[in-house]
Amino acid sequence: MENRFQNDTLFSEWFGQSLSDVRFPDNVTVYSQADSAVSFENVRQPIKLVRAAMGSGKTTALIHFLKQVPRELSVLLISCRKTFAAEILHRFTLNGLKDFELYCDITERQINNRKVIVQIESLHRLTENYDVLILDEIMSIIKQFYSKTMTKTKEVDCKFLSLIKNSSHVIAMDATLTRHVVEFFAAFKPDTQIALIRNTFVSAMFSNRIAYFCDTFFGKEFSFFARLEDKLRWDKKLCLFCSTVLAAEYMYDLIRSRFPLKKVLLLTSKQGKCSSIESWIRYDVVIYTSVVTVGLSFEPVYFSSLFVYIQLAKGGPDMVSVFQSIGRVRRVIDEDIYIYMNPVLIRSYDPLAPIAIPPCSDWSVAEQSIISESCIDFRGKCSGAHKYNFCSVLKSLFRYRHYIEKTTITSLSDSLFLLCSLLCENSIKVDIVGNGFPMRKEVFLSFLQILVEECHFIEKKITLPGDDMTFQEIISSRETIMNGDFYENGDQLLHKDYITDMGKFRATFLSPGVDIFIASDIVYDLKNESKRYVFVNVWLQKCVSAGVESTEIERVFCERIKCYMLPKSFLCDEYFVLGDISGVYEWGMLIDLAFLAEMIRKDLKLKSCTDTTTDISEDDLLLCAARRSSDILQIMQLVFTVHVQFFQKYSLQTLQLFNKLRGMRIVTGVFSIEKFSISILRLFFKCAFNMTLSASRPRYIPGKAYRNLTKNDMENMLDNWEISRTNLKTCKELRKALTEASRARRKQTIYKLQGSDISLSVSEVGVFGQHASPGVCVSS
């Protein structure tokens, strides 16, 4: 029973499908609505929790309810997104609810208006409690507590709980509302009656749809792009969702090259936030990413088909976000959705473990037991987050769901299973190469294998260097003049504050030998979030290495990094925050990561965690993994949402099943402790510092590349090896002799880190001193 529970109900438990067979607390009354849209008629309980699919009339029922609320009662609606809040206000206004105000239209810092629509991140601005509280898309609201944009987590959490406690009427709605939400309300307000409305009605505009999963992108009649081309040749209007900007740009270029006369609209984060979709009817193809999500709905009967390109990638949108974005087009004429998953970026033989398997009828008991063990291990590591001081009750209560969402991104089988479950729950039929869902395991595994074998890389666009001058060129040029606050050289402008900003950054964070021009190059790289994350981890690890107390590190981190502003360009018209990094971590997780990184650095005898010059012996790697594997696997899950089990769990049968679920080649050899140790350390360095741990041969001189050996170096080495160098006069002759002699001597395998050694530039922080004055002198 434990195996079945773990395998069959992990997703249903956390994404709402299990509400039909749960025993709820005594103050919860369950209402079932199956044949009609959501309705609050005859539901008298003051707290109403609604689980209903997209297109089931939740918003319509809400508007009807609000029209009956006495005017003297105050009403607050909390949304998960600013665009969603604006769309709700628009719908309210169209339906006669004209006394609501949008929080971003209120100029006063403190909000005490009687009827307000507010986005969750701005909840701390509210000064009053409200009689009626509306939580539309409550799971998305809770999800925002994990967003990097949630800068006042504690204040928002406290206000959120206060609003629930003091409101006389609460309505919370979501398509994936879970029993944990019900239990939270029941425990938080035990003396209040609660109605759980389970509405299973789905309008025909969703229930008649079929989602066709394509196993290839190119290459055959029913491939993803072949179907798209066929639709366009018939002059069909298409909507295409892409999970990443890279995929969206790729599809945009591909469609434009094949169909140059078609009008194609591209909507990604590079074009800015999408606040309106009314203009879509002017285009033949609309390509959008998750910038179009909850709250924006395209209602006209215009698009014939919906295409979905999912590029699975660490840090990309999870399957719930994908599912929500798919539902933005409310009416599809041909009632078909074509979905392609590209797993090329998560293809790996590292021992990543899935956490669930689809409910195929023919899984063996052994296979179910393997996944059950993985699921139990996953839950155990996630529960380790208890030790951290979460500043949010909501984050603590719902962290499992967030870990599931983020962990499944790097698992092909988990992502496919979860997306299919969400589609089926919304009464959208699933077709995987002619098979419904769920299906026989061999069909499922075969589909995964073809996906992996036929997947393709998307080449990133390379931006060729233009005519723009570098910081150093502008400052050094004799033709540069001072024009007001700007240094000017032809069309090139550089604000004087940029020099000051670079000087301050250099003095605060960088080593004495780093000049202001290198500092400018580093700041340019830090515009990339992944580079910022590495910088933060390096800085923290160096603090630990210098023996700084964790409380002092936290203080300086908050003062110098978390809110440190850097210019996006020479013009200093826009700034970004150095501490603007995504993740599910708390401060305690970051500092634990830094302490673990320092212990690993010492074990491997590295100068830093980005040291590219030191050879790492295999013995040191194995000893480090033996000492630190438990801590590494815990941090990998809690900080990086990467699920790896302990070595003892990886039997040959386990590896074979995991590789099948990844669509990879079946393993025939033994998975040794050496391979496991190298794998987990490779994952750690890649996730924490973007460094690649690779096998190599020992360097001739530690810390010195072969190509940099001098004639004297080579002569000394040959003498030490007792190799005659008679008649060896030139460097070429010495190098050849050294190479031949080393073949018999260099049999040992060593490892080294490859990547950018940013640690060389980051300052030692033992006393948190500054190495230079904030500015530089620039002659005119």
From Swiss-Prot:
GO biological process terms, semicolon-separated: DNA replication
Coiled coil: none
Residues that coordinate or bind ATP: 52-59
Database matches in Pfam families: Herpes_ori_bp
Function: Probably involved in DNA replication. Binds the origin of replication (ori).
Homology family: Belongs to the herpesviridae OriBP family.
Protein name: Replication origin-binding protein
Source organism of the structure: Human herpesvirus 6A (strain Uganda-1102)
The encoding gene: U73
